Structures are given as C-alpha cells and as structure tokens.
Amino acid sequence: APTENIEGLRIGVASVRPETGEVVAMYGGADYLENQFNNATQMIGQAGSTFKPFALAAGLENDVTLATTFSGKNKTMVGTYEVVNYGDKSFGDRITLLKATQDSVNSAYVELANAVGLETVFNAAKRAGIPADAVGMEPNLAFTLGTTSPHVVDIAAAYATFASRGLQVAPSYIQSITTGSGDILYKLNPKPVQAFSTDIADTVNFALQKVVEVGTGKAAKALGRPVAGKTGTTNENKSALFAGYTPELSTAVMFVKDGPDGQPMSLSGTGGMRSVTGGSYPARIFTAYMKGALKDLPVQKFAGLPTGEPNGANPTDSPSASAVPTIAPVDPAAPVVTVMVPDVRRAKVADATAVLQGLGLSVVLELQPGADSTRQLYVLDQFPASTTAANSGSVVTLKVVNVLP
C-alpha cells in the first residue's frame, strides 16, 4: 500500500466465493474505533473501466465476437458524444474487441454499447449483480465507461458471476446461525441463477485473462496462477480499481480519497504517483492478498475459449487494425453469407442504413465534429470501403455530417 501523500485515502477490499456468493473476506479500513465506516460495503466510487466486461458480455450475447472491430481512435464521435481514451491515446483506426478489452480502449467500448443497445448493456450489468439502485446506474453512452458508483463488494460479487461461468448469486455474509445448544437456526442455501450462458462467461474469462497477460492488469501476473481481471481508472483520477478473479475467488480493490471538505478528490500524488491507475496499487494489493488467500488451494484453470458458436474465433493478441469485422451467425448450422459492401458515401444516413441493413450488415454512426444529430445527416465516409467482402452481421461504420464538402 502507498505510504506517501495518503491523507484522506480510503481503501476497500472484498472477496466473494463464486457459486455460493459467500463474502469470505473484506477490508473496510484500518481502525473501526477511529472511523465507523466500512470501505468495502459503504464506500462508493465510480467503477471506471471495470464496467466494460458487462458491455463485453452484452455484445457477445448479440452476435459480436472478440474478432469484431471497433474504433480505436481517440476522440471518436459516437452520436453526439466525443469519446476520449485514457491518456488521449489512439490505438489504431480499427481494433478487435479483444484488443480493446486488454488495452481498455474507451472509443471501442462506447461504439460497442451503442451498437448493441444501451439498455442491453445496462441489463447485463444488473444480471451480473450490480444493484439497480447503485448511484449513477443509468443507461447512457458513458455507462460502459463506469460512471456508476457501486460498493466494492458489489463489483466483487458481479465478477464472481463470470468466475462461476455465468452463475449469479447474491452476496451473503452469514453462513449459519447456531444456538448454544447446537440447534441450527439458519444455514446458507445459495440460489444461483444462470445470468449468462457458460459460453458467454467463458469468452469473457478468456478476454479478461488477456488483460492480465498482456494488457493493463499485468501486475496481477505475479499471482502465478490463472487469473482474469480488469482495471478501472476514472476521470480526474478520483477512483482507481482492480477487480479480478480465479475460478475459486473473486476480489475487488478500490481506492478513493476524501478532501478536507469530505468531498472526493484526485488520487494524483498518492504514493508518489502522478496518476494512480487500477493497474498500479490496486492490482498490486489484489495480487499480494490473493497469493495468501489461495496459497493452500490447488491451482484451477478456466474452461477456455469456446469452440464454434457463439464465439469460435481465437484472435491473436496483436490483430490487424484494418481487419474486416465479422460477426458469427446465431444458428451454428447456418452458412455465413458473404456480401460486397456497397458505396454509400454521400447518401442520406437513413437511405444508407436501409441499404446496409438490407444486406444483413450492422451499422454504427460516427457523428463528425460540428454535426447536429437533430438535422439531416449524410455519409461522409465509410469503413470498410466499398467492394470489400464482408460476412453477414459485420459492422459498417459511417462517418456522418450535416453538409457534404
């Protein structure tokens, strides 16, 4: 844990056992006698990119694959929303969803949420276990970037849903209650619900393992056993998180900082770091804690990426930025239909969308700077270009403006 510039720092940690929902450990603060506030169950902070796996699961349920490509560019326009990537970094014109996950690319994830539907992503988060009444729980374009502020234990419980291959169980703090004479008054009886199919959960697990292996969560590699996870760092650095799990245990670590007035303040400078990211202190604390928590348990592996439907692609860690997006058909027995992408440049957006959807293609709009979505829109450019061969269900991105040059 940091030792420099820590005045006002709050750290919350919670661990949940997948399949049973048992909260087996939590850290709520250094001294309850000094501060009667549990950082694990009462503290809130914006979740940041730890919410991206819910959008990932929603996309996978709607025929998106880890090989589907989205914008990796900084300041991509999605509708009227300008999406800024962390550090103002661009990752390429088009990147696969797998790369967007491991590198936590905001532009790609907002495009994904817009394509599959904001309510769809919102409902996926609720199914995973994020409470519907969490602060800021509203389906908007920024939702997938973690503008919601759940409790630490909520995030640990939601990630436990992926660890248990899609089984969601409400977190529980009491295993049993027994009288002095030995009578059992209460015994935990978990009631798991299949929130996501095993294939969807296994694919999420595959992608989040890549976050640790080659992405923003590399600090957790030191755990030395299969682990999946996601970093979260928010605007103005007012919270930083790492949420991760093995098949046996799901744990979330959150940092927030209170200013002299009790209001959230930037973590900048904490521990001597210019910016405290989820991949820094939170991931290190996660790793150190999990080493101790799991030391006497045999190593378990995740199930692995499913073969065939719904996500048969096994993308590389460094895919081509110009790869044509592909989306698998719903019916595994149905053949993939290849179509030639038509030239819809200079067409009205409504007409272009009708043509593309008529060919079985999906459409994502990128509103260009200065364009007004309430007025007539025209297609300035498109990706992929015309005459490109694309599979049915592939995404075509249209750059749209009000006035053509």
Predicted regions located by residue number:
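Solvent-exposed coil/turn segments that connect beta secondary-structure elements
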Residues: P18-T20, G28-Y32, E61-N62, K75, ...
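Conserved catalytic neighborhood of penicillin-recognizing serine enzymes
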Residues: E19, V64-V121, Q168, G180-Q209
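Ligand-recognition elements built from short beta-strands and adjacent flexible loops
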Residues: G224, P298-P405
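Mid-domain, small-residue-enriched loop/turn segments at the edges of structured enzyme/sensor domains
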Residues: E82-N85, G117-A157, Y173
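A penicillin-recognizing enzyme superfamily signal
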Residues: A1-N5, L9-R17, M26-G28, Y32-Q46, ...
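Solvent-exposed, polar/charged alpha-helical surfaces in well-ordered, non-transmembrane soluble domains
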Residues: E22-A25, N35, P53, A57, ...
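Sec-exported extracytoplasmic/periplasmic mature domains
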Residues: L56-V64, K75, Q102-N106, N114-L118, ...
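Active-site rim segments in enzyme catalytic domains, especially the processed small/beta chain
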Residues: N38, Q42-G79
